Amino acid sequence: MKYNTLNGTDLEVSEICLGTMTWGRQNSENEGFEQMDYAFDQGINFWDTAELYPVPTLPELYGDTEKIIGNWLTKNGKRDELVIATKIAGKAPFTKHIRTTGFTPKGIAEAIDLSLQRLKTDYIDLYQLHWPTRNTNFFGKRDYPDEAFKTDEWKDNIYEVLSELGKQIASGKIRHIGLSNETPWGVMRFIEEHKREASLPKIATVQNPYSLLNRLYEIGLSEVSHRENIGLLPYSPLGFGVLSGKYLGGKSPEGARVTLFPNYSRYSGPIATKATEAYHEIAQKHGLSLPQMSLAYLRTKPFVTSTIIGATSMEQLKENVESASLVLSEEVIAAIEEVHNTYPNPAP
């Protein structure tokens, strides 16, 4: 396993980050424990979770994923060997059971304390804002959000948010901060406040979707990463499992995410399916696993710090982790780019 420095910090993180979103709903606590045991043994030292998890959300399951991690940490005593990232939920209709205030100093402080309790730790290495509380494009929204902009009641409180996060860092409860599901404008607003007042914490990472089916990060945010030293933590690198190839041919595997939750169709449109078929042909031609090829491609990008992989079975997890040793040939990369030119970003 290779390691990278988490941007602007002294933390070394594995190139693969263990995703946890299904623990507590699709996966039991024992299955989560098994995944953590295996990941740790493979040298993965970076785990990502959120107060919102598991997803799809249910009020009665709020925070259960963090609790599973906390129980494992208590059992194994390996907290100091790990880099733990979690997130505060934004304001949305599906988070009313968590809070309705968005990102406020009081809400942030309370959310951190609750996450610490569930994780059974006294510090969080990377604390992230899960999505913007303003109206903009994220979670698969596309095109110009004219009506959303017109009805947006958001008041710019980014200075206030950074000030509170700075206090939390000073207290030792969190170490570094990141954003998620953000736009170039949003990231630069946080950077602007830090540059205006250096005592405010600087954003270290952005956790956004990035995969062969969604390379929008390259259009605007990659330059922000390059010029401002912000690392990308790609999530959904296999597009809800679509790039595993298991849905090809119209298949609906029992227990698979899109089978269980048909509304999760972001990566399953007709053009995305054609692109997936084309990527699958490349993998077959070169004797590669489609998911391993898809994950290895992301590591070729200099702005990627660590790729978040989630799995509902040990078989999936092992195959994904094994991608860490795969180096793609120039021929494979060229073929991938050719497909991308034909089907650019079919699942934004």
Regions inferred by a protein language model and the residue ranges of each:
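Beta/alpha (TIM)-barrel catalytic core signal, keyed to glycine-rich beta->alpha loops juxtaposed to Asp/Glu
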Residues: R25, P132-E338
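N-terminal binding-site loop/beta-alpha segment at the start of enzyme catalytic domains
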Residues: M1-K87, K106-A109, D122, A170
